[in-house]
Amino acid sequence: FVDCDYAIRECMKNTLVVVVDTHRPNFTECPQLLEISDKVVVIDHHRRGVDFINDTVLLFHEIYVSSTCEMVTELVQYIEDDVRINKLTAEGLLAGISLDTKNFAFKTGVRTFEAASYLKKSGADTIEVKKLFNSDIKDFITKAEIIQNAKVINNNICLAYTKTETDNINIVIAQAADELLNIKEVEASFVLARKDDRVFISARSLGDRKS
């Protein structure tokens, strides 16, 4: 991976910039690239918000699929017959599908399983995928702290927070938000954290609520 400064130096007007898993400029790692390049592609599955990346050369936006990884897998699978992905890429895409579907429990359709089947045929190892979600001891303790601080309001909404700052705090709070949905009668969860003077919020819900 490269940082924003390096990307800005390397990006030119005809550079292809691909934005995945968001359609909002301020949610990208380096919004400046969207101003430099004339070739922007957006691939996303979230409901359209007020802020939207305009002037794209390709917009692939479907809110009824499980994940952006499912969409990328479909592109790879159907655009060209001779496209092959390596084992690591297949495992990364399968991990993304597993994460967004809570291990194929939510927002899972026929296309989701077809994508997973293709990734498995491409060499994805489910044990290696599981290992991608393993936490180190510090992150594990932080997640436990979040769950310990959780409060249920209105009988079905769970709120939690942590004051601990870690490098992977956005991943930790996402995993904690998923865990909180396992509490009986909880339909939605919100977890807050702070890092580098920025506040991160991870929201999760069951099918009846929008997250």
Locate the predicted segments by residue.
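Short alpha-helices
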Residues: 45-116
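Hydrophobic/aromatic beta-strand patches that form the interior of the parallel beta-sheet core
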Residues: 16-18, 39-43, 58-61, 158, ...
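N-terminal small/polar loop signature for handling phosphorylated ligands or for N-terminal nucleophile
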Residues: 1-35
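Catalytic-core regions built around general acid/base machinery
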Residues: 32-37, 115-118
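Residues immediately C-terminal
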Residues: 25, 48, 182
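A generic local secondary-structure boundary/capping motif
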Residues: 5-8, 29-32, 59-62, 83, ...
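Hydrophobic helix-and-loop "lid/oligomerization" segment in the mid-to-C-terminal part
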Residues: 1, 8-15, 94, 102-211
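Short helix/loop capping segments that flank catalytic or ligand/cofactor-binding pockets
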Residues: 27-29, 51, 106-107, 170
